[in-house]
């Protein structure tokens, strides 16, 4: 009996794990298919089936029995506590406190407990009340198949869905309908009665927390009113000034005030900076104005100096013009006095002899005798000219001499006239240098000695005269030390040449005084007498013999010079001859020479005035 009992127990123990494994496999396959049908990705972890505490105890007891039977220690492949959460463990511990101890139970009690657990597991889906479920699991009746596309779930064939009408293993941890949203499920779960009960509960809770909530509500209401008023104001402002502001919302009042204060501060700073700049500019402009006034005063002083110089220059020119006229009159009076004053022929011969012995031209010798100076003496200092009081005299004086300034400053070609050409250019018509020399009984210009008419300077070295203008500054004028010595030397030579011309005229006047018959010959020419040419020839021969005897120590060249002079100026009274044209020619030449000398003297005075004006500048 004992052996049969042990065999029966072994068969029962071997069948129990098989039954348990079969039921667990069916439950696992059903649970997996159901999860794949609903939400395989989202609810896979929450839908795990946890075993009941009775099942766990039964499995533990079966393991112990098998270990005792086979006397082998082996670890079970299945961990009964795997996946069990802490609340289940706490619940298990709580249940164990009410259950009897393991050792006190017999094998029959354990078998009975296992069978009851299996029966409960089989009857659990059938005995579940349908009132707690708001809707069935039939997906064909409750919602269309097209809604599955929105939830991106896998579509199962219809033949499988018909057989899958089992309830879920854990209703608490899974949603009834996975294709419905959470808010839809909540709305369907709460009936009007439940909502009414909830409302009453909330009202009771509100009464309990009434005072605090009222204060908070008041604050919230006031804040809402304040914000509503501000919104209304801003809306009105935006509507009224939408075009100006561009449709943007207005800033709050505090920000406006801050921005206005910042703008006022900026404006005040800008105004202060502008005022400082204006003050600086005023100071600078005041300094500049003082400097400009000083410059204006200096320019006025300079202009006044220039104007005074110009006025003085013009006055001197006017006085020079007047003095030139006086000199012309004085020259005429001097010539008349020379004509009236008789000259001795012996004095003339003595002068000629002295000039020959000293190798000095007769003109220079006469000048030396006149001035009482040595040949290389200094030029007589020139006296300052008196200035007229009124400037109106300038225009009156210039009426008679329109080319006064041009003749003084520059020639027509723009360059100063050379002394050699000055005489030839200013000669009157019908009068040449050869005629004058023939009239004086001297050689022609081609055969003259260079010592008698020297050319003391070269034409290439002639400096052009600098015209003066009132606007010319002092810095633009050439320094006096650079050009004045040469100019002074040139002017001295030019004055010497003019003096020679003047002395030539004086010499000619003396000759005319010596032989006054030439002056009275005008009437004789008008009524020529009847005299023979033979008597004239005889008288001329007598004069030549007397001169040769007086100048027996002279050279043949001097005698040749004096021969034509004696021929030109006979000693005795003129006799009637047959050559009246010759006498007319001599008279005309003398008149032209006198006019030329007067003109040259006037020009000399003008040049002298211009030179003095240039030196005083």
Curated annotation (Swiss-Prot):
Keywords: Calcium, Cleavage on pair of basic residues, Phosphoprotein, Secreted, Signal, Sulfation. InterPro entries: Chromogranin_CS, Granin, ScgII. It is found in: Secreted. Residues 1-27 form the signal peptide. PROSITE patterns: GRANINS_1. It holds the Pfam family Granin. The keyword Membrane does not apply. GO terms for molecular function: chemoattractant activity; cytokine activity. GO terms for biological process: angiogenesis; eosinophil chemotaxis. The modification Phosphoserine is found at residues 174, 268, 432, 532, 555-556. The modification Sulfotyrosine is found at residue 151. Its main location: secreted. Residues 28-30 form a propeptide. Residues 92-105, 258-284 have a biased composition (Basic and acidic residues). One of its GO terms (cellular component) is extracellular space. Residues 68-105, 120-143, 258-290, 407-427, 551-582 are annotated as: Disordered. Neuroendocrine protein of the granin family that regulates the biogenesis of secretory granules. Interacts with Secretogranin III/SCG3. Binds calcium with a low-affinity. Belongs to the chromogranin/secretogranin protein family. This is Secretogranin-2. It comes from Pongo abelii. The gene is SCG2.
